Amino acid sequence: MLALKISVYTIVFFFVGIFLFGFLASDPTRTPNRKDLESPQD
């Protein structure tokens, strides 16, 4: 039962993390006021 709970929490946090990361990563692209996005600094 503990393994099931751990696996469920892992999957939930995994998808929540991906959703939050994708939302925060795509958020500046929706704001046309950000001019620094045109010159990516890797």
Curated annotation (Swiss-Prot):
InterPro entries: PSII_PsbI (IPR003686), PSII_PsbI_sf (IPR037271). The keyword Coiled coil does not apply. It comes from Prochlorococcus marinus (strain MIT 9301). It holds the Pfam family PsbI. This is Photosystem II reaction center protein I. It is found in: Cellular thylakoid membrane. GO terms for biological process: photosynthesis. Keywords: Membrane, Photosynthesis, Photosystem II, Reaction center, Thylakoid, Transmembrane, Transmembrane helix. Its main location: membrane. SUPFAM superfamilies: Photosystem II reaction center protein I, PsbI. The chain crosses the membrane at residues 6-26. GO terms for cellular component: photosystem II reaction center; plasma membrane-derived thylakoid membrane. The lineage of its organism: Bacteria, Bacillati, Cyanobacteriota, Cyanophyceae, Synechococcales. The keyword Transmembrane helix applies. One of the components of the core complex of photosystem II (PSII), required for its stability and/or assembly. PSII is a light-driven water:plastoquinone oxidoreductase that uses light energy to abstract electrons from H(2)O, generating O(2) and a proton gradient subsequently used for ATP formation. It consists of a core antenna complex that captures photons, and an electron transfer chain that converts photonic excitation into a charge separation. It is a single-pass membrane protein. HAMAP family: PSII_PsbI. Coiled coil: none annotated. Belongs to the PsbI family. PSII is composed of 1 copy each of membrane proteins PsbA, PsbB, PsbC, PsbD, PsbE, PsbF, PsbH, PsbI, PsbJ, PsbK, PsbL, PsbM, PsbT, PsbX, PsbY, Psb30/Ycf12, peripheral proteins PsbO, CyanoQ (PsbQ), PsbU, PsbV and a large number of cofactors. It forms dimeric complexes.
